[in-house]
């Protein structure tokens, strides 16, 4: 969902586009210095030498507790980006979320969220976003954490489907993400296809794509526990599962229907 929000920021002119270079002095002399937005969205920032997939290797700190500013000063100070390849690290999403606030300011960011979720998506309940609990009030820092009802998540998926089909600016953003997808390399494991993240061959700007290795534009969002939303843009189909645990047959309930 952070990526979808990013598309709206681009369409409002706050960011030049997915190929723009991150412009924030806190990134100086870190792996994000001169990084392209699309590489960060694609989990290809080169952070794999410093991050174990959940925590930072040298400090064991969890990125969802500490501000982006703190992380750049401690864990990633004088860091050098590794190979440009897919490596899932939630820090990348936190960087994008925080970068939006840096470019927009909190006031404009909150205004845009209202325009997206209330006016466009039509949510019926609140959306709660999670900021790092050890950050300072007013800091331009945010995590990927987001809470909303299962029906409001579905409404977001419908809005994405409509954007794609109506070729809105945000819809073109989603198509650009798909055109700039990257291979997941060894992370693609069709022999262990019980989960969407294993079954998808590519990654496109925060979305799993390439179900069964196919080239059809089906976007997959995998969240906490058993949260799973699948959007088939060509066939106007959405399948959403909002279970607490992931102990369900994904191939039977989801994959077999595409």
Q: Where do the language-model regions lie?
A:
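Active-site Gly/Thr loop motif
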Residues: 123-131, 179-239
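Active-site helix/loop module of the DD-peptidase/beta-lactamase fold
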Residues: 11-48, 75-78, 104-143
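Structural recognition of the beta-strand scaffold that forms the well-ordered cores
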Residues: 39-42, 87, 125-129, 145-147, ...
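Carbohydrate-binding/catalytic loop surfaces
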Residues: 57-65, 131-147, 192-197, 202-205
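Active-site-proximal binding-pocket segments
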Residues: 112-183
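Active-site-proximal alpha-helical segments within enzyme catalytic domains
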Residues: 92-99, 144-166, 227-244
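Short, gly/Ser/Thr-rich active-site loops of penicillin-recognizing serine hydrolases
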Residues: 249-258
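Active-site SXXK
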Residues: 1-17, 40, 96-100, 153-156
